[in-house]
Every structure is written in structure tokens, then in C-alpha cells.
């Protein structure tokens, strides 16, 4: 019975299931289809203009208050008489440039005054070296100005080279300084090679053949410059028709020259060439007068370059000639103004070394302006390229730093130093021959 009932229930359940599956399917709830959004092109908005940033003009470095330059000069000691002529030349030139506002330097776009520091080296090369080192370390100088005397410059030029500071110097004729390969040394002043031949050329140009003092005595100082110049006089003599009949050597500071004088007199010397200091030169000529030897022509470089020569020797010092590097009678621009300033202070026209010293500052200022900077190397290059007229006339430089400058011959006449060569610059005629001392 239970089995039948179970079968009936299963059948009923199955029928019910089939009936449900055969009925209509229910309507599904519609699901909205996603419609892609309409693509609207973006509106192009122009960017906000940004004004360009102005490039600032390069700022110039601040200009120094002054252009520092420095000099070591023998104002005392054996070269003191020379240094006394050099110092005013430097100072007057600096004053003149500063009165015009200074030196224009393009790097700073303005004129800057020169500031000159001067030390007295007491004619001592060791002290001169020390002074230049001080100028370099403390004043930080843009350029050096030299002192006076060949052995002084020989010492100081080496310091300029070591420190790579441009150096302008005069009052020295020693050529060998320029043969050391120095790049910072410049000298607008005649050197031994010129003096060693110019004397013969000038004599031959002014004295007729047959009247020339062809027998020459040389009194050579035992110094580097003495050896150099004496050797050139000796070497060049035969080329111009002259003979060296006596060649004497002496140490600086010698007191007795009588032996040398008597030998020259006995050899029949008609001309005397020498390069003594002021004390040696005056002693030499006083003894020549005492011994009665008056050469027809005397070229005595250095000693007679100071007015004290005339004061000390009077007529004994007359007729002597010099190669001083300049004379205040030269007709170049600026000479008259220099003489006027010197006259106001010293009651005479400018001394022989004052003009060349003045020219050094003119050359330096011109070079700084052309360089457009205070860079020492660029100033050095500008000095090397110098081509200008100064109070000593036209100036250019050779590769070794020697200057191409006038080499004037000056002669003592009537208590004054007169310019006798070149002829277009002369202030007096050449006086020749020199009479005996007792006939003056």
C-alpha cells in the first residue's frame, strides 16, 4: 500500500514540474542600453601670453679707485744724481694724465687715475729688488717704472719678469739685459749698440776728413756696461776710419787717474771715450787739466749729465759731449709744457733724464687704454705694440724690449748743455776742436 502511494506522489510531482516548464516565459525587465556620450571637441583656449624675461645686460666689474704703479729709484747713493732727474719725470706725467681725468679703461667704461708709489733704493740693487717685491705684494701694482743705472736695472728687471709685471725703464744703456729673453722689460732709451757706432757716424757727418780725431783713447769702467760699450767702441772704430791707440780699465771709485791719462797723452790720443760716474768723471777731468791733456773731442757718458758737472768743473768741463737719451730743446709735443713745469719748480728747463722718464708714463697710459683692461699680460702686449710720439719723439719697440728712439748728442758749451745732433733738433752748432784747458 505504501509503495503505491509513493509512486502516485512521484508521478504527481513530475506532472506538476512539466506543466510549469510548458507555460509562457515571463517578460524580462528591460535593461537600458548604454549609449556612448557624444564626443564634443574641446574648445581651444589660447595660452595666456607670458612676457619674455629680459636678459640683463652684463654688469661691469667695479672699477678700482686708482691704477697702482710703482717705482724704485736711487734718490741717494752713487746714482742719486740720476734718480733725482728720473723722479720728476714720472711724477709730472702722472699729474698731467690725472689732470685730464686719468686713463680710460674700456673694461670699466671710465677714466681711472694713476697712483704712483716711489721708494728710494739708495743705489743698492739688493734694496731695489726688495722694493719691487713690496710694490708687488702690498700695492699690487699694474706696472713697474725703473730707476737709474745699468746694474740697478739688471737686478730689478729680473724681478719684473718673475712677477710677470710690465716694466718700463730708462737711464741705462746696458744691452745684455735685453738678451736674457725677458718679455716684460721695455726701455725707450738708447743702448750700447747705438752708442757704440753713433759717435763715429756723428763725427764723420760733422767734421771734414783730415780734421777728425781718429786716434782714440778709451777709459773703460770695470763693470758689465763698461766692458760692453768699450768693446763696441773698439770693434767699430776701424769701420769708420778710427784707431784705438790706448785702452785703459779702472774700478769704479778710483781716485788716481794720472797713469791712464799720461799713457793716453803719450799715445797721441785725440779723442777720449768713457762712461764714469759723476765722482769719477770730475776727478778724471780735474787730473787731465793738471796734466795738460785736453783731447780735441770727449764723449763722456753719464758723469756730465747732471748740472753739477758745470758747477764742479767750470771751463774744464766744457766741450764734453754726452749721449743722454734726450734734451729739453727737442721739438716734440709736450716738451714745452714739461719745461715750463720743471722751470717753475727747479728754476731751469727739464734735466736730461726727466724727458725719457716722462715718456715711460706716456707709453704706459697709452698701452693701458689700448689694452682696455688692467690685466698685466694684455698691458704687456700693448706696450710691445707701441707706436706713438712722446716727449722723446717717436717710439716703437723691438722684440727684445729695446726701443727705437732718437740718440741725441749733447755738448757742454758756455756752462749749458746744448743739443748738437741731430741737426733738425739742434740748439747750437757742434763746437770742435776743444782748445787746451789753459786757453779756455
Regions found by a protein language model. Give the residues of each.
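Extracytoplasmic ligand/sensor domains, especially the bilobed periplasmic-binding protein
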Residues: 126, 141-247, 296-321, 328-329
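Beta-alpha junction/loop-to-helix N-cap segments that form part of ligand/metal-binding clefts
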Residues: 81-88, 103-179, 188, 250-257, ...
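C-terminal motif of bacterial Sec signal peptides marking the signal peptidase cleavage site
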Residues: 17-21
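Extracellular/periplasmic periplasmic-binding protein-like sensory domains
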Residues: 285-358, 369, 374, 419, ...
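Short, polar/charged alpha-helical segment
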Residues: 82-106, 231-238
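Segments of small-molecule ligand-sensing domains
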Residues: 344-354, 365-421, 425
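Ser/Thr-rich, Proline-interspersed low-complexity disordered segments
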Residues: 13, 23-63
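Extracytoplasmic "Venus flytrap"
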Residues: 70-91, 119-125, 148-151, 219-228, ...
